[in-house]
Amino acid sequence: MRFFSVFDIVKNKANQLGYTETEMYAVLKNYNVNKKDLLAYKENGVIPTDKVLNGILSYLGMTKVELELKLGRIPAGLEDVFLNNTKEIAKILENKNSVKLNEFNSIQEIKPYFYTDLGKLYNGDCLELFKQVPDENVDTIFADPPFNLDKEYDEGVTDKNSFSGYLDWYYKWIDECIRVLKPGGSLFIYNIPKWNTYLSEYLNRKLNFRNWITVDMKFGLPIQNRLYPANYSLLYYVKGDKPKTFNVQRIPLQTCPHCGREIKDYGGYKNKMNPKGVTLSDVWSDIYPVRHSSSKNRKFNELSVKLLDRIITMSTNEGDVVLDPFGGSGTTFAVSEMLGRKWIGFELGNCEIIKERLKNKDKDKKLLGKVYEEKNKLFPNRVKELRKKNGLWIDDDFRQDHEGNSKGDKKNENNDQISLSLE
């Protein structure tokens, strides 16, 4: 396993010596390292300061250079040595390398738990199930992995892992995502910012960065001695120079719910505004968490239909393939079905919830219908009527001077032609 924290390296050494965690802390005291000192390096990749570092190095029986290499880093000040000795280093690595590429012809086919005309759902570990997917076979991947917060995601399915164990697992399935993506395919990773900082550093060496999207997390709980956590992060990367599909997404102008007046004053520019709405930015404040039981399909966390509709319509066209390695309640698959996308789904936990959801789509059709009441409109009908009532301008006042989209928008703004399976 790869190591990403000093704590995990120390713990691994203790395991090799047969120590319990309590015994490990007792032994470390002999090296002037107390429990509090070591725990400070449990959930990060920071290397300790001199006093603590010297004690840890003595316990591990290694130098600082060896410790940094153990963490997968080129030690500071030795970059030139590495660059000037790449051939020798490569020979050492190649002689040690015994990893074999997946040979799909020799892999036993796994039967899907459930399938429709558009997609297949598999029940099991995503790392095993990825082996069923050939190289460069998927147009878009959306992944909402466990956040490693010691939460229960399904009956008997929790996500507590060590710092290094979590990142090591994370990078393995990310590599599989990259393998199965088509050239120009899109990868979206939904997680808390802490983990996406590590992931973005890794992905920047493998894919083309497009956006770090901030998704407003409303009504979260405060954490002591920290800033109030108010967002999730959605990483958006592309395999290759540019996405093979990018459909412009537009949202309504922000208005007061009581009078309909716009929140921001656009002054003399209002007649130049696109009647299809405001171009979507990388801050999404209109995605509300699914918390009410009437909108949920299970008692655990669930993603918004609006979120998945936006991601899927932005990065795919009808008939394209969408993959989600952590199916959860099945929102990705339900939205893919309604948008006419093919899909591949993995889920380690209870797949029966997803199966029933896909067989009974009435609730999701209603939710998606509400999304499209506002999508690609400067003012939804209810807001437009409120503004007219209060004598405020509406886009119809300027439509004759604004012939639809601009030339640049027409090329990729085809969301009006999306065929929704809402009947």
UniProtKB/Swiss-Prot annotation:
**InterPro entries (alphabetical):** DNA_methylase_N4/N6, DNA_methylase_N6_adenine_CS, N4/N6-MTase_EcoPI_Mod-like, SAM-dependent_MTases_sf
Q: Keywords for this entry? A: DNA-binding, Methyltransferase, Restriction system, S-adenosyl-L-methionine, Transferase
Top EC class per UniProt?
Answer: transferase
Q: How does activity depend on temperature?
A: The protein is very stable, after 18 months at -20 degrees Celsius it retains 90% of its activity.
Q: Where is this region: Disordered?
A: 397-423
Look up the EC number in the record and give it. 2.1.1.113
| Residue ranges of the TM segments | none
In alphabetical order, the GO MF annotations are: DNA binding; N-methyltransferase activity; site-specific DNA-methyltransferase (adenine-specific) activity; site-specific DNA-methyltransferase (cytosine-N4-specific) activity
* Domain of life (superkingdom): Bacteria
- Biological processes, Gene Ontology terms: DNA restriction-modification system; methylation
Q: Which GO terms describe its cellular component?
A: cytoplasm
* PROSITE patterns recorded: N6_MTASE
Reaction catalyzed: a 2'-deoxycytidine in DNA + S-adenosyl-L-methionine = an N(4)-methyl-2'-deoxycytidine in DNA + S-adenosyl-L-homocysteine + H(+)
Q: Where is the composition biased (Basic and acidic residues)?
A: 397-414
Q: Output the CDD domains linked to this UniProt entry.
A: AdoMet_MTases (cd02440)
Its family remark reads: Belongs to the N(4)/N(6)-methyltransferase family.
Other comment: The protein sequnce was determined following expression in E.coli.
Q: What is this protein called?
A: Type II methyltransferase M.BamHI
Identify the gene encoding this protein: bamHIM
